[in-house]
């Protein structure tokens, strides 16, 4: 891609969550970003103005619902409503990071299922399709009645480590049981075995014990996760792997939320390098020397073109 794309009916708009990524995606597709503005009334209400005609157009809106989650979500919902009322033919949401995905079920009594609520809001506002990346819970796709293209960053992350020639003694590690499928996909691409961190609390008020299922002694370990938030799990896992004899520990994730003590924990951990994507825009204060960021612009740009041309996107899932 990156050549000029000749279809005036294809429009890409960006809101405020990750404009840099949106500009990269538009460049990959070969068109300019659509003209729109987001302003606020004095009481904080969001006002959106679409500054060009989109009547009969197939519109793609790029917006992650990352921090500030509620602000970014409301921007998106208001934008969808504006596009619907301006007679867009289709309204396609490109959401690299789907916020509220961790609230996908009732873990305790009287809890909401917020991932479903967000899906309802997006659909009710008028979205006709969604393209997203590595949802925390893949079953959230079932909360929608519109088509969802659920991409993953495993190929991008795997290629990074493959190009670094880390040797034959690689092991891909899942930091919990829920991430085993993701770890297995990376392991298949790197032709490496997997290991699993099994966290157990032997009895109440006793610290969790990290048991490692698999052989990591003398190995170079790559921990893969979908989200790193406070970095507690991944840094404790890295420490446990080193104590079990791993020679080096790398870590990677699709969504670097990185809140609270995350940066200090990563800096102080035995992790050699943390590789993340740009699904979430990172401010300067969240950058450290041992971090590297990969762009998902080519992946999302290719998905947009294929969807627009009614071509298959299934090869992008592999």
From Swiss-Prot:
Q: In which pathway does it act?
A: Metabolic intermediate biosynthesis; 5-phospho-alpha-D-ribose 1-diphosphate biosynthesis; 5-phospho-alpha-D-ribose 1-diphosphate from D-ribose 5-phosphate (route I): step 1/1
Q: What is this protein's gene name?
A: prs1
The residues that the entry says bind Mg(2+) 1 are: 136
* The organism's place on the tree of life at top rank: Bacteria
Q: What is its EC number?
A: 2.7.6.1
Q: Fill in the subunit field for this protein.
A: Homohexamer.
Q: Per the annotation, how and in what number is the cofactor bound?
A: Binds 2 Mg(2+) ions per subunit.
Reaction(s) catalysed by this chain, per the record, are:
D-ribose 5-phosphate + ATP = 5-phospho-alpha-D-ribose 1-diphosphate + AMP + H(+)
Q: Which cofactor does it need?
A: Mg(2+)
| Intracellular or extracellular location(s) | Cytoplasm
Classification via InterPro entries: PRib_PP_synth_CS, Pribosyltran_N, PRibTrfase_dom, PRTase-like, Rib-P_diPkinase, Rib-P_diPkinase_bac
What the entry lists under CDD domains is as follows: PRTases_typeI
Q: Does the keyword Transmembrane apply?
A: no
* Record protein name field: Ribose-phosphate pyrophosphokinase 1
Q: Which residues make up the binding site for ATP?
A: 43-45, 102-103
Query: What range does the record give for the signal peptide?
Result: none
Among PROSITE patterns, the record links this protein to: PRPP_SYNTHASE
Name the job this protein performs. Involved in the biosynthesis of the central metabolite phospho-alpha-D-ribosyl-1-pyrophosphate (PRPP) via the transfer of pyrophosphoryl group from ATP to 1-hydroxyl of ribose-5-phosphate (Rib-5-P).
Q: Which residues form the active site?
A: 199
Q: Which GO terms describe its biological process?
A: 5-phosphoribose 1-diphosphate biosynthetic process; purine nucleotide biosynthetic process; ribonucleoside monophosphate biosynthetic process
Task: Please report which protein family the annotation says this sequence is part of.
Answer: Belongs to the ribose-phosphate pyrophosphokinase family. Class I subfamily.
Q: Name one Pfam family in it.
A: Pribosyl_synth
Q: Where on this chain does Mg(2+) 2 bind?
A: 176
PANTHER family tied to this protein: RIBOSE-PHOSPHATE DIPHOSPHOKINASE FAMILY MEMBER, RIBOSE-PHOSPHATE PYROPHOSPHOKINASE 1, CHLOROPLASTIC
